[in-house]
């Protein structure tokens, strides 16, 4: 079903009419366990197209595209994917759908309706377009490929498990127990060998980014810059005491180290990196003993802290570069609470964030891409979860679920 903005819901697809009841692959089972979706069935995930006119969703081992303004008998389109697949996603411009099948990266051209493999060496110990076990389990990185904003390239991870030891683990079911062999990089043992590639969805042209001579490292994060001409990646040493942020020129593959984060203990990874249109960026760091945000210019020179003091940022929620505002989640005012705050991008309010959320309790916010409004889920020991749509200043636009 879909909420139409007027407080009403419209039924789109009946999962029972499409679901074949196909058995999930081991990879998909593992993904659902990590996202706490293992006990669910039917349509459990979906993605909007960039123009908001279509929905992509997997169901019963098949992949479907639902077009909202199409006639009822033409609205649901089954895409040409045969067999088990994972991680299907629409490209930012809506031209393609990428997915991983047989440990290879594939792409569907939605104009022609044709599907083809972008990599062909996957299988066995070789994986393309997937995040390795450690990345998924310990680094909060489930993705193994990343679309350029203009659809020109896909950056993807290729990893080789050849030298990773094999262990045995048990899977216990109500009627049986199964022994599963799995490659597991225990402490002191070999890790996977990682490569970072760039491939064109249009012609399959592929190139590789030089990750350096040190091979016992983690590919922690990959992010495209808004111009689609540059890619960034974060490389962490295995002892987790050094993290490098690098920027790659896509045309020449020349690289620049923008910053290096070091710690005598370990570095907590963050997903709060944001590149702005001018090439400058926002970086999250615990260097002060608290997690705060810092503004860097395009060459990696620190210009100023965006937040500071004896309090933590929990999460970067959104950036409104036009109006110079940054929105974060924090417990700045009262430790048991989770609230939404606004900070000035120029650092002028670094020590005094402005609270946006109204009620005391727990607020979980999802901001629009331009940070002009957000979806707020609020709860309190005496109040069940309430969902509302709000302007960036916290004022109410519409209740979704007043509860």
How would you label these PLM feature ranges?
Residues 1-385, 389-390:
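Beta-propeller folds
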């Amino acid at each position: 079903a879909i909420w139409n903005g007027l407080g009403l819901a419209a039924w789109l697809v009946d999962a029972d009419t499409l679901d074949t009841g196909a058995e999930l692959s081991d990879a998909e089972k593992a993904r659902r366990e990590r996202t706490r979706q293992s006990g669910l069935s039917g349509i459990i995930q979906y993605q909007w197209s960039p123009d908001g006119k279509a929905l992509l969703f997997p169901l019963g081992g098949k992949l479907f595209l639902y077009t909202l303004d199409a006639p009822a008998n033409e609205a649901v389109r089954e895409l040409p994917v045969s067999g088990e697949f994972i991680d299907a996603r629409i490209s930012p411009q809506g031209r393609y759908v990428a997915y991983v099948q047989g440990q290879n990266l594939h792409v569907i051209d939605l104009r022609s309706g044709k599907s083809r493999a972008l990599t062909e060496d996957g299988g066995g110990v070789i994986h393309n377009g997937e995040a390795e076990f450690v990345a998924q389990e310990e680094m909060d990185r489930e993705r193994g490929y990343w679309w350029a904003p203009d659809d020109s390239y896909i950056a993807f991870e290729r990893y080789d498990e050849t030298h990773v030891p094999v262990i045995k683990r048990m899977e216990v079911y109500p009627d049986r127990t199964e022994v599963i062999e799995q490659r597991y990089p225990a402490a002191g043992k070999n890790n996977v060998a990682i490569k970072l590639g760039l491939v064109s969805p249009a012609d399959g042209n592929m190139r590789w980014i030089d990750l350096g001579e040190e091979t016992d490292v983690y590919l922690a994060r990959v992010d495209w810059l808004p111009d689609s001409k540059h890619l960034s990646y974060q490389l962490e040493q295995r002892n987790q005491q050094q993290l490098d942020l690098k920027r790659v020129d896509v045309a020449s593959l020349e690289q620049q180290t923008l910053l290096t984060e070091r710690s005598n203990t370990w570095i907590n990874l963050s997903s709060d990196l944001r590149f702005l249109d001018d090439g400058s960026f926002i970086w999250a760091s615990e260097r002060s003993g608290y997690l705060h945000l810092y503004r860097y210019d395009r060459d990696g020179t620190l210009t100023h802290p965006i937040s500071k003091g004896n309090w933590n940022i929990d999460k970067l929620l959104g950036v409104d570069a036009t109006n110079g505002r940054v929105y974060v989640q924090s417990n700045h005012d009262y430790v048991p609470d989770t609230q939404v705050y606004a900070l000035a991008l120029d650092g002028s309010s670094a020590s005094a964030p402005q609270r946006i959320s109204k009620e005391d309790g727990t607020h979980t916010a999802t901001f629009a891409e331009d940070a002009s409004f957000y979806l707020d889920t609020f709860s309190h020991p005496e109040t069940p979860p309430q969902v509302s749509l709000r302007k960036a200043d916290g004022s109410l636009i519409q209740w979704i679920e007043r509860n």
